[in-house]
Amino acid sequence: MQVKEYFKAICNNDISRADGVSRNSDRTKRLMRSYARHQGSQASIPTILADIATNETEDLSDETVASYLSALRKIFVIEDMPAWNPNLRSKTAIRTSDTRYYVDPSIAVAALGLGPNDLINDLNTFGLFFETLCVRDLRVYADALDGAVYHYRDKNGKKQAFFFEKRVFLQK
């Protein structure tokens, strides 16, 4: 199935099947477009909502957007990256907002209706999609090693895009 057809299936059918709640396909498209514009960032639900509202004729609530995002998570379309915290008792102020990502960058490309020439002519956007591709692959490798991938950003803006941590379990 081509990614454009997959995108249509998500918007028209799959999102409502996630939890049996009927959802508006046009609203889903606008949400997925906004999410694609914010991938790789720690955009809050109100930020995404404000982005959607520029093209929305009716008011949406934070709860509605959260419900749509939850459904997209359930059907494995999006997977946010949690923040890494070095130590629970650390005095260092760490930003703990999740970073927004599609599980596959091609879904974001389809949501924005982009093609190869669009990406070649906008290298900043291309870079965000490449980052999403790296996140996807790192998650696959981390999972095989029983690890997880995180992002890190402190109060001064120092950041590490990807941080791998292997889970270690102590046995008696």
Task: Describe every region a protein language model picked out.
Residues 172:
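Short catalytic-loop micro-motif centered on adjacent basic/acidic residues
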